[in-house]
Regions:
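A nucleotide- and high-energy phosphate-metabolite-utilizing enzyme signature
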Residues: 1-260
Length: 260
């Protein structure tokens, strides 16, 4: 607390946290609906030239939701890169409000150069690159954590008889499992496999499970130049349409895109 009774603040905070945990599973669908509506209204921070640093997908408010999901004991949340990204977005908003003298959250074009200069970036392009990268990191962390929370909720649903999540074959050893694409077996040391798996999952509009991404990231790099099979698969991946963005986000966070 900035001022006031520390014990009172701690008591209120504890009561609110208890109430949130007690009702979080019932409130989760409503929370996700509101989240999707807000993202639709304000767009994707990583893809917007004049982003709303607070309300957009990948913005500051999404970090609040991320923390709330973890505080509800629905799932763990990632740390490290997402915390750094959040701090960078806070710095941008602070600089924006210093430059404009107002409590703004939208980074307008007219403020790009001044904010970049205040934060020590060479130009507005460097600033926007950082904002986009940070927004992408926060968005991916939130989306993955929200999926984990949904999976946790479904796992606790009472069922008659033993519960076993179905594996739906998608092809090439890839399966759909609880809303994600997973590999059915430990991958062989095939550097083309990440592209093959990405194409299958993107066509099904499914994100890759974190464990599968980690396994793919551990595979060796593609040779230079790429073999024809890899080039054809990469072309197929770019042509997968609406399923590509969620797939690309996972590949980026796993550093696979950087290695290509």
């Amino acid at each position: 607390a900035v001022a006031g009774d520390v014990e009172l603040v701690a008591g209120v905070r504890s009561t609110l946290a208890h109430d949130w945990r007690a009702g979080a599973r019932k409130r989760l669908p409503q929370l996700m609906t509101g989240l999707a509506a807000r993202h639709t209204r304000h767009g994707d921070l990583a893809q917007t030239i004049e982003p709303d640093l607070k309300e957009a997908h990948g913005g500051l408010r999404d970090m609040t939701v991320l923390r709330a999901l973890a505080a509800a004991w629905l799932t763990d949340r990632p740390h490290g890169e997402v915390d750094t990204a959040y701090e960078q977005l806070l710095d941008v908003r602070d600089a924006l409000q210093v430059v404009t003298g107002r409590g703004r959250d939208r980074l307008g074009r007219e403020d790009h150069d001044a904010v970049a200069a205040l934060l020590g970036y060479a130009d507005a392009d460097d600033l926007l690159t950082m904002v986009s990268r940070s927004g992408r990191t926060v968005a991916y962390a939130l989306d993955a954590t929200a999926r984990r929370a949904g999976q946790s909720q479904r796992a606790r649903t009472l069922r008659v008889g033993p519960r076993r999540s179905a594996l739906v074959a998608l092809g090439y050893g890839v399966f759909e499992h609880d809303g994600e694409a997973v590999l059915g077996t430990t991958p062989a040391a095939d550097p083309v496999l990440p592209l093959r798996v990405a194409v299958v999952a993107a066509r099904a509009a499914l994100p890759l499970a974190p464990a599968t991404l980690a396994n793919l990231a551990a595979l060796p790099d593609l040779p230079d130049p790429w073999p024809s099979a890899a080039r054809e698969l990469f072309t197929d991946l770019l042509a997968t349409g609406d399923g590509l963005p969620v797939m690309w986000a996972g590949l980026t966070q796993a550093r696979l895109v950087h290695r290509w």
